[in-house]
Amino acid sequence: MRRLLIRCTKIEWITKLIDKKRIMTTQEFLGKKEFAIQDQTVSESCPSNIALIKYWGKYDNQIPANPSISYTLNHCKTNTSLEFIANEAFSVQIFLAGNEEPKFAAKIEKYFSNIEQYLPWILKGKYIIRTENTFPHSSGIASSASGFGAVAKCLMHLDGIFSGKASEEESLRKASFLARLGSGSACRSLYSGLVVWGECQVKESSDLFAVQYPNDEVHEIFKDFNDWVLLIHEGEKSVSSTVGHGLMDTNPYADRRFQEARENFGPMKEILASGDLHQFIKLVEHEALTLHAMMMMSDPAFILMKTGTLEVINKIWDFRKETGLPLFFTLDAGANVHLLFPNNGSEETIKLFIETELLQHTQKNGVVKDIMKF
């Protein structure tokens, strides 16, 4: 009982602190009350991202319980066209790859209503949104990140027309802020390279928006990487990410996990500067497995990995032990495996191993090939 009381008191204190900071800092994103709307169609594209230090657990209004860092992918993107019809009753129609999606439209309507204070014109018309992904919807690549990122970019494009243009830096920061309110990790997709979300020792980092990790503090080995996603399971997840985040509220190991993620930023900064691949592999794989350990220690517990996930992980470990080559993995909140390896001269041997030994564990030899180059 005493432990529970201490934990609740701590959470209440943190929440009050976060609320105070949020009131002080969200003011800069409030929209202009004077605007001139018109019929307009805009189009934007936004990539997905894969986290290295994981975000799992949040407070109200998409405030992360710990900071995270991710790679932005180069090819896996969402392309979105947003048509705004001025002065019609507010409504949203959404077409994903040509098919109307009423459930997603309802979600976007709620999202638009929630961000009206930041875009005061947003409820003054009708929207027809057409969106397509360059990757399979259930591939384990975060379509919500690229999807909300693309929508946020479209909204800022419209805001520039209706309310007056902001600087490119200000517009991008506000797009990241707005994307976060739709899907937390979406805020990281607005920037290229390595991206940080959550207040930490990285300069200008914030819980409210993402910032680009300084490229001049990243060793060249980390600027040209592959991410091959093995499609172990393409069906719907048994537990959604939204539910999973919520279960961290009662997870007895949550506080230690949040502390560990913050602590991991120190070693990660040193690793990125030095080019220490061995330590990078160790930290990234540890973060991936910790994410899934949190799921298994939730109440109720749940497991998103499949048999194929574990078979692939064991084969990667055996391959690395036998060859010393830098093939390693990370996982999102699902069964599919992100295979990470640098373009450092060993990639052809690694690709051959993937194709001959790992593809057999996927559904229909499914793999999505991407790169992170910056």
Residue ranges and their predicted role:
Residues 26-28, 121-222:
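Gly/Ser-rich oxyanion-binding loop with an adjacent helix/lid
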Residues 73-75, 190-192, 223-225, 334:
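Short, solvent-exposed loop/turn segments at the edges of secondary structure
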Residues 19, 23-61, 85, 91, ...:
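C-terminal nucleotide
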Residues 22-139, 153-169, 349, 363-374:
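ATP-binding N-lobe of GHMP and related small-molecule kinases
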Residues 4-5, 17:
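Leucine-biased recognition of intrinsically disordered, low-complexity hydrophobic segments
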